[in-house]
């Protein structure tokens, strides 16, 4: 019989928030008897933007902004029904994007 696996991918702009959410997921899964692999930190995606300061002249004067997207990956191997219910009821902060895939 093939084992089922849940792959969870977290994305957030704040690394403290994403680490806290990952820790909550790991504790919940372990408490319900599932095996957790991770969280694995994926490469941080950085987007840089150069904006002209002046609306008319002075093209050499620019502001630079950057946006960092932190990512974590976790696998929950052979989850029970109790694990899935606990993960669905878990309340995570609004700044964390969660993608869940069943494999």
Curated annotation (Swiss-Prot):
Annotated SMART domains: Ribosomal_S10
Keyword Ribosomal protein: yes
GO biological process, one term: translation
InterPro entries: Ribosomal_uS10, Ribosomal_uS10_CS, Ribosomal_uS10_dom, Ribosomal_uS10_dom_sf
UniProt GO MF annotations: structural constituent of ribosome; tRNA binding
Keywords carried by this UniProt record: Ribonucleoprotein, Ribosomal protein
Pfam families reported for this sequence: Ribosomal_S10 (PF00338)
UniProt keyword annotation of Ribonucleoprotein present: yes
CC terms in the record's Gene Ontology section: ribonucleoprotein complex; ribosome
General function of this protein: Involved in the binding of tRNA to the ribosomes.
Quaternary state and interactors: Part of the 30S ribosomal subunit.
NCBIfam families: PRK00596.1 (NF001861), rpsJ_bact (TIGR01049)
HAMAP family listed in its UniProt record: Ribosomal_uS10 (MF_00508)
Family: Belongs to the universal ribosomal protein uS10 family.
Name the UniProt record assigns to this protein: Small ribosomal subunit protein uS10
Protein's organism: Leptothrix cholodnii (strain ATCC 51168 / LMG 8142 / SP-6) (Leptothrix discophora (strain SP-6))
Gene from which the chain derives: rpsJ
């Amino acid at each position: 019989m093939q084992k089922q696996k849940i792959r969870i991918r977290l994305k957030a702009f704040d690394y403290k928030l994403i680490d806290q959410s990952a820790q909550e997921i790991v504790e919940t899964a372990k408490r319900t008897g599932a095996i957790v692999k991770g969280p694995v930190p994926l490469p941080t995606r950085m987007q840089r933007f150069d904006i002209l300061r002046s609306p008319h002249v002075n093209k050499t004067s620019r502001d630079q902004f950057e946006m960092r997207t932190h990512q974590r990956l976790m696998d929950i191997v052979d989850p029970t029904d109790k694990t899935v219910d606990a993960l669905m009821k878990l309340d995570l902060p609004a700044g964390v994007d969660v993608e869940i895939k069943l494999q």
